[in-house]
């Protein structure tokens, strides 16, 4: 959870510095917080810790690579992305014209950032997780080179790669079966 918060915070802050306050609840049982001292920090007390999150002061061109997206209309959108950023981050930060892309904002709750990779790039990607695979099962236009853009982070080896957005989009959040007694909320 903390790692995800840091990733989201880093993406939101970009190259600016920010400060985040994290609340840590004590573990159940006697003794309160591990390592706490003094009265008032046991039981149900809440300790506050300040965490500083900051990006690099300036991004050099060496830290960026070129990525080509082919959107649903067949138009090629070329942009730059920072090494380490996800493909979802690249689309959002560069305001690329890809309708509905990243509806869940990278929380692995939809499949709207479904992308199809070139074979030579696909072979270099990190192994797919079970969670990503479950979301991809709900995606339209699934291929053997499909991945979710929110799960793929840029590396130097991806420079000048081309990824294709499938012709149709599917949002897994809209295809959840709520059971026989559920009604559609409009």
UniProtKB/Swiss-Prot annotation:
One of its GO terms (biological process) is cellular response to forskolin. It comes from the Eukaryota. Residues 65-169 form the 2Fe-2S ferredoxin-type domain. One of its GO terms (molecular function) is electron transfer activity. SUPFAM superfamilies: 2Fe-2S ferredoxin-like (SSF54292). Binds 1 [2Fe-2S] cluster. Residues 1-58 form a transit peptide. The modification N6-acetyllysine is found at residue 64. The modification Phosphoserine is found at residues 61, 175. One of its GO terms (cellular component) is mitochondrion. It holds the Pfam family Fer2. The modification N6-succinyllysine is found at residues 64, 156. It is found in: Mitochondrion matrix. [2Fe-2S] cluster binds at residues 104, 110, 113, 150. Belongs to the adrenodoxin/putidaredoxin family. Interacts with CYP11A1. Essential for the synthesis of various steroid hormones. Participates in the reduction of mitochondrial cytochrome P450 for steroidogenesis. Transfers electrons from adrenodoxin reductase to CYP11A1, a cytochrome P450 that catalyzes cholesterol side-chain cleavage to produce pregnenolone, the precursor of most steroid hormones. Does not form a ternary complex with adrenodoxin reductase and CYP11A1 but shuttles between the two enzymes to transfer electrons. This is Adrenodoxin, mitochondrial. The lineage of its organism: Eukaryota, Metazoa, Chordata, Craniata, Vertebrata.
